Amino acid sequence: GFFGLENPETQTKTNPALIKGLKFLSRDEMTNAAQEQIDSLKSDGADIIIGIVHLGVDKSSEPNTSYELYRNVTGLDFMIDGHSHTVMTEYGEDKLPIQSTGSNFKNIGVIVIDNATKEIESNALIDVSTLTENDAAVEAKANEIIAKIDAEFGYVVAKTDVDLNGDKAPGNRTQETNLGDLITDAMIWKIKDSEIALSVPDENVVAITNGGGIRAWIYKGDITKKAINTVLPFGNSLAIAYVPGAELIEALEASTQS
């Protein structure tokens, strides 16, 4: 039996329009909901219960991490985790049965279940880089899709003389980067180039973007539309808000507190 849980951080990390009407559980509410799912699956006859969750093991996500959830429920046999991009087949000194494959399809998670004992026999990660043989049919289909993407988004829109930093940390989530500067400068340019009349002087116009939304590097040379879409894949909208300077400082301090 499988059940899923999403990190409550989602409600502050995604476009509000996309989650309108949804409620994200946290703390005891999330634990209780998980226990209800486990009990329901057990009563329906499930021999093994696996949680497919996007909670992670970052300390900053406490008290809503996968390891805290596991420790506070009963009857959960295994967890497949995400969010923190951790590479692991178990967690902590007490070896909690939590698997996470990292990120960017670098690993494939494998779970072996013994049909006779109805128990999880083993779990492992397969390093994708070790898989060197191509399946001809899959490769042909992939090349077909890649060709369509290149035809639509492979055109050059700009050039750069330097590499533009797409790293997470240290990088766009922890400090100023040239790619973060370029993106926010572009946001300001777009607003000033539009027909929108701003009610503040130009020197009071600033741009803020979510560091977690910057997903890749752009390397020296041509910049294609595909490269831009790879860096900014979420299709967010540009919004204008008027805030007092004190609130802006508060927002910046909140984003740098850790």
Please provide the spans of the model-predicted regions.
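Loop/turn elements at helix/coil->beta-strand transitions in domains of secreted/extracellular proteins
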Residues: 1, 42-49, 74-77, 95-96, ...
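Active-site-adjacent helix-turn-beta-strand microarchitecture at beta-sheet edges
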Residues: 1-28, 59-157
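Short acidic, glycine-rich surface-loop motifs adjacent to enzyme active sites
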Residues: 2-12, 34-60
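Amphipathic, non-transmembrane alpha-helical secondary structure
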Residues: 28-35, 39, 249
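Solvent-exposed loop/linker segments at secondary-structure transitions
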Residues: 42, 61-62, 78, 91, ...
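Glycine- and other small-residue-rich loops at beta-strand/loop junctions that grip anionic moieties
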Residues: 53, 101, 172, 176
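Short, ordered loop/turn segments at secondary-structure junctions
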Residues: 54-55, 83-85, 211-213
